[in-house]
A protein has these predicted regions:
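Glycine/proline-enriched, intrinsically flexible loops and inter-domain linkers
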Residues: 1-754
């Protein structure tokens, strides 16, 4: 068969511009063949090269005394946790595949991030998920589509994680109309390793053999990286072949075989085959090693016949690795992979010429300078245009509503409601390390082999980011830190997943720029370096762009098991104390702007994002963590979506205890309509607030400590009884605990199961 002629149409179909094609011609000194065009297409896609965002990502702080492997150096960052132990962790997205094939898209997202972790030499110990979908309550075709995506994604995550034995122990699920045509599936994984076990993905040692190990290559996932670098359209369902198919049982074998091999002295370098498959693993290892790699596709294990070099190189079949083996240790690889009944083949050799050279049955198919391919994609500074600041809320125009009905409606909203329908599908007790059941402020996991207790969370309120990208991103960092603090952890580091729409739209690219600035500022304030992450662009469908969603994954460490703290109230008679302001007096919208109350109860995305003071936030968190370490705190809960009323309800529901609370008011609220003042006290989303449950004998000591730290604080009430009663601005909201619990615990289940 004759080779295709490279035309302008073919170049455009591969997602390359005329200027990029001219750059390729300059690198090669000739026209590329069709296989080389495909190779450049995937490696220079946004998914692999970050060509639209790399200049922005350089704003992140990436260094610190605990950083052992920095962002961008390897497949995942690595952080020192003491006593010779370290953690490798990262967050990745599988958004586009999950929109087309939710089960396989989500499942292979889990498999991919797990491979990133064990490629570093770490044993994966747990994962988290940050998921976004359109509304699921309703009978329209869109609601049905959203439910099918939600069900498929959760089932795919559960299938892969449960089968491979890596527990999913937490995360977040957010529902909003902006995700109607484009759900988001962000997956976080963390692994544990000793310092000396850190593995590198570099092709070192000229003459060292290159081994392919793992599943055979097929045509699934063909050019998946390029698929993930364009908008979803009505025709995207035709891209179903670009969605990979995963086998968690095969990956479990691959994990164990690779860790066993890494424990020997046989490995010079190791790289998983994720996005761009064999292409990416070959050129990246060569580029990192400052060497060349030559492989012959005739030696690559294949499960389909008649595959072309183009298909073999661009396939994203799962559960595959590339290993650079120290010469003379080939038999070690053979013995281990035969033991684990996994395919393997010696497919090439490390060269000294800096080239990625691919043969097909001895015939030259690809010859490209590896560093140019892996590291020299064009970088763009996209045009941006700031959006005008949103108008403040007209509080006098907010209709008066029944506050009890509003609370029940908020508790029933799937973003706020219990995610037990999701959690019960996950075997979160695999490895017996899950110390806090899913649903509290952060996941807590005991790593017994290292005698360490880790905490992790994922956070982002996209309503905040939509209204003010920089402030919303600052709050995402602060809330992640607050969730870890409420669990008794000190902060370590951050990974992120930047989910945005089309970067060629100036207003949408401005959202990304501002969000990066906010994340970077937050990380500097909390001393949490960014260890790596993912950028996912082109998240928009015919329904429109998603709301900007810079998801934060943050990791902390709990120094003593006695410090593990949860959000549930513990005992009748305990005193409820608020660390932080009841209401931010400087908030022009009374902290109702961009709130879930305004969205869910009044049906609007409106107003200004709450303001965040890093100074106050850090003082509140430091004081609360100190109180936890002093043994004075029985429960701690971050106050976020839905405000104080929702946070109090969650602590009551978790502890199966009622509460009687009075929220302090003041003359500053008298200038507002009474119903607006009550709404602000109950449902406003002022920042830097933590609800504490304190034994009565310790209440005065806690209040004195907060006063000494010059932190706004209030004694709100007591735990006990069988109802939740909250008095605010002269009126009382009261409901039996059973009535409060029902919508919270069963809303998602009713939507999904009828």
């Amino acid at each position: 068969m004759s080779a295709p002629v490279i035309t302008k149409e073919l170049i455009a179909k591969h997602g390359l511009t005329d200027e990029e094609y001219a750059r390729i011609q300059g690198i090669l000194g000739r026209d590329p063949n069709i296989t080389e065009l495909g190779v450049f297409s995937v490696m220079w896609s946004e998914h692999c090269s970050y060509k639209n965002t790399k200049r922005e990502l350089r704003k992140f702080p990436t260094t610190g005394p605990l950083v052992l492997v920095k962002a961008g150096e390897e497949n995942a960052g690595v952080i020192d946790i003491g006593d010779g132990w370290a953690v490798a962790f990262k967050m990745e997205s599988h958004n586009h595949p999950s929109a087309i094939e939710p089960f396989q898209g989500a499942a292979t997202g889990v498999g991919g991030i797990i491979r990133d972790i064990f490629t570093m030499g770490a044993r994966p110990v747990f994962s988290l998920d940050s998921l976004r979908f359109g509304p699921i309550h309703g009978d329209t075709e869109q609601h049905k589509w959203n439910r099918s995506r939600f069900a498929g994604v959760v089932s795919g995550i559960a299938h892969y994680g449960n089968c491979i034995g890596v527990p999913t122990i937490g995360g977040e699920v957010f529902f909003d109309e902006s995700y109607n045509g484009n759900p988001l599936v962000n997956v976080f994984c963390l692994g544990i390793l000793k310092h000396e076990q850190i593995a590198r993905g570099a092709a070192k040692g000229v003459g060292n053999p290159v081994f392919y190990v793992g599943a055979e290559t097929g045509r699934d996932g063909l050019a998946g990286a390029a698929f993930a670098s364009r908008d979803l359209t009505e025709e995207s369902k035709q891209d179903r072949p670009a969605v990979q198919v995963g086998d968690p049982f095969r990956e479990k074998l691959l994990l164990e075989a690779c860790l066993e091999l890494l424990a020997t002295d046989a490995v010079a370098g190791i790289q998983d085959m994720g996005a761009a498959g064999l292409t990416c693993s070959t050129c990246e290892t060569a580029s990192r090693g400052g060497t060349g790699v030559e492989i012959d596709l005739a030696k690559v294990p294949q499960r389909e016949t008649g595959m072309t070099p183009y298909e073999t190189l661009l396939s994203e079949s799962q559960e595959r690795m590339l290993i650079i083996v120290k010469k003379g240790h080939e038999q070690t690889v053979v013995d281990i992979f035969e033991k684990w009944d996994l395919p393997y083949a010696e497919v090439g050799v490390v060269k000294d010429d800096g080239m990625m050279r691919v043969l097909d049955h001895g015939k030259l198919a690809v010859e490209i300078p590896a560093a140019k391919l892996a590291d020299d994609a064009p970088l763009y500074s996209r045009e941006w245009k700031a959006r005008p600041e949103p108008a403040p809320l007209d509080l006098s125009a907010l209709a008066a509503v029944d506050e009890k009905a509003a609370l029940l409606k908020l508790l029933a909203h799937p973003t706020i409601a219990s995610k037990q329908w999701v959690w019960r599908q996950f075997d979160h007790m695999v490895r017996l390390g899950c110390a806090v059941l899913p649903g509290s402020d952060a996941a807590v996991f005991i790593v017994r082999e290292a005698d360490k207790i880790l905490a992790a969370t994922s956070d982002c309120n996209s309503l905040y980011v939509l209204q003010d990208p920089r402030e919303g991103a600052r709050i995402a960092i602060a809330e992640a830190a607050r969730n870890l603090t409420c669990s008794g952890a000190r902060l370590l580091a951050v990974t992120d997943n930047l989910n945005f729409a089309n970067p060629h739209n100036p207003e949408l690219f401005w959202q990304l720029r501002e969000s990066v600035e906010g994340l970077a500022e937050g990380c500097r304030e909390f001393g949490t370096p960014v260890t790596g992450g993912n950028v996912s662009l082109y998240n928009q469908s015919p329904a429109g762009p998603i709301d900007p969603t810079p998801t934060v994954g943050m990791v902390g460490i709990i120094d003593d098991a006695k410090h593990i703290t949860t959000q549930a109230f513990k005992s009748a008679g305990d005193v409820i104390i608020l660390a932080g302001p009841v209401l931010d007096p400087a908030a022009g919208d009374l902290s109702l702007g961009a709130s879930h109350y305004v969205k869910v109860v009044h049906g609007r995305k409106a107003g200004r994002t709450p303001r965040l003071s890093f100074d106050l936030e850090k003082r509140v968190q430091a004081a609360v963590l100190g109180l936890i370490r002093d043994g004075l705190v029985k429960s701690a809960h971050d106050c976020s979506e839905g405000g104080l009323a929702v946070a109090l309800a969650e602590s009551c529901i978790g502890g199966k205890l009622g509460a009687t609370v009075e929220l302090p008011s003041g003359p500053a609220l008298d200038k507002y309509p009474a119903h607006a003042a009550r709404a602000a006290l109950l449902f406003g989303e002022s920042q830097s607030r933590i609800i504490l449950g304190i034994a009565p004998e310790n209440a005065d000591r806690v209040l004195a400590a907060l006063a000494a730290a010059k932190i706004p604080h209030s004694r709100l009430g007591t735990v006990g009884g069988d109802k939740l009663s909250i008095t605010a601005h002269g009126a009382t909201l009261a409901a039996p605990l059973a009535e409060v619990s029902d919508p919270f615990e069963h809303s998602i289940e009713r939507a999904m199961e009828g």
